A protein has these predicted regions:
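Tandem CBS (Bateman) regulatory domains
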Residues: 1-13, 52-85, 91-100, 115, ...
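A generic helix-loop boundary/linker signal
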Residues: 16, 20, 46, 65-68
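Short, charge-rich amphipathic segments
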Residues: 25-36, 54-62
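A glycine-centered beta-loop-beta connector
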Residues: 30, 38-54, 99, 107-123
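The conserved cystathionine-beta-synthase
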Residues: 17-34, 41, 86-103, 110, ...
Length: 136
């Protein structure tokens, strides 16, 4: 069975967030696109972090609880800056194993520091089932 590369399976235009966006803008992007998180990309296309819906919810609830305006917080303040990523030519099955081991639902795909796409569990599941179907 031939293993696909990440490039063959990844999305090349994932929803991304701007590090300067406020938490309400980030929440709206997450809700409108029905996703659970997104990579944070600067104006040069460089991956600078990731934000989950839990990060956003935590920022809003914490601000409200403390009597502060939750709209003041920026994505850059609540994002996870240490991001696991892979390259477009990596093997899908190996990346899937890493994602499972680290309990991650999505993986940014980066080449020369620039975000090229994103790989999700659903895309991997589709690719693996297609490989099995083709082998039968």
């Amino acid at each position: 069975m031939k293993m696909a590369s990440v490039r063959d399976v990844m999305s090349t235009s994932p929803v991304t967030l701007d590090p300067d966006a406020n938490v309400y803008e980030a929440a709206n992007t997450i809700l409108v696109n029905r996703i659970s998180g997104a990579p944070v990309v600067d104006t040069d296309g460089k991956l600078v972090g990731v934000v989950s819906e839990l990060d956003i919810l935590n920022a809003i609830v914490t601000s409200v609880y403390n009597g502060a305006d939750p709209g003041i917080a920026r994505v850059s303040e609540i994002m996870t800056a240490e991001v696991e990523s892979n390259a477009p030519d990596d093997d899908v099955v190996s990346v899937a194993r890493e994602m499972l081991d680290n309990k991650r639902r999505r993986r940014p795909i980066v080449e020369d520091g620039v975000m090229k796409g994103q790989l999700t569990c659903r895309q991997i599941l589709r690719a693996v089932t297609d490989m099995v179907d083709d082998a039968q």
